[in-house]
Amino acid sequence: MGAGGRMQVSPSPKKSETDTLKRVPCETPPFTVGELKKAIPPHCFKRSIPRSFSYLIWDIIVASCFYYVATTYFPLLPHPLSYVAWPLYWACQGVVLTGVWVIAHECGHHAFSDYQWLDDTVGLIFHSFLLVPYFSWKYSHRRHHSNTGSLERDEVFVPKKKSDIKWYGKYLNNPLGRTVMLTVQFTLGWPLYWAFNVSGRPYPEGFACHFHPNAPIYNDRERLQIYVSDAGILAVCYGLYRYAAAQGVASMVCLYGVPLLIVNAFLVLITYLQHTHPSLPHYDSSEWDWLRGALATVDRDYGILNKVFHNITDTHVAHHLFSTMPHYHAMEVTKAIKPILGDYYQFDGTPWVKAMWREAKECIYVEPDRQGEKKGVFWYNNKL
């Protein structure tokens, strides 16, 4: 959901599944970032404080309305209706708060305003409210953007090589195993990433915990701000403790806890599907460069949720190319650069539930083509 006007861009022509799964080119593109930037109207790079706040305030108003309805009217409902009302609240509040998360994420990219202090203040407040350590995310996520598609240096959703698949992997390569893995991924994946860097790149030099200021993820200039992030999380946890003490644990779980689980599940789903697709290459150090890595991502279609999520879902390619660009210009930018990107642009309109299952089935590990000339280019495979 958003406030303010936004140009409407006609959706990409519908592709057949064969076209959707066709590999994107892995050769050095015949265009440069500078040429892409020249094709974009200059106003698309301008950040507006009133406009940025309008989207945030709108999301807060909607979330507050849901909270008011749940606390005021749900206690009056007979039990059969309350069993329907609460799941509706959880789903609606979860997706709206995901939109709030997206705006806070934009602050970490310095795409909210022209003032870094304002971006950091807004991002710290709203990421902390959603139990995300703002500066920890800001710095590790920045490294993800700097190293997207690199098997050695990317920060998250780094695919395994076939040789790294555990012995029990083949026993999970079935419908039941995939169901279990997806359930764990969408319920525990987000906190496990923060606490233990699960799905992140390995750090042999030390324990990679996003809450630990001395973790090898960060450099010396960043460590003090990790303490600030941790303080923000502790402050929110204390507030939740006081709320639970006053209103009851059940109230806190129903009004905040379950919607937060929905937020976490959508964040894992969105990022997983943005970077996992049978058509996308990954590169080792012999082939990787920033532009090809940034193009190793895919735009998806979540229907009406595209707007609720501030188009982070269907403009992700443009976001990786120009991460300081405000989200409310991303549709226009995508339209401007698609003719230049050509086959390097990947859009998949497969319904997200179907795509989630397909990717879990098809994208188990990466390996180079046996007959391919480029041994440093890796593609997804599922044959164990």
Curated annotation (Swiss-Prot):
This is Omega-6 fatty acid desaturase, endoplasmic reticulum. A motif (Histidine box-1) lies at residues 105-109. It is found in: Endoplasmic reticulum membrane. It comes from Brassica juncea (Indian mustard). It is an enzyme of class 1 (oxidoreductase). Belongs to the fatty acid desaturase type 1 family. The chain crosses the membrane at residues 56-76, 84-104, 117-137, 180-200, 226-246, 253-273. A motif (Histidine box-2) lies at residues 141-145.
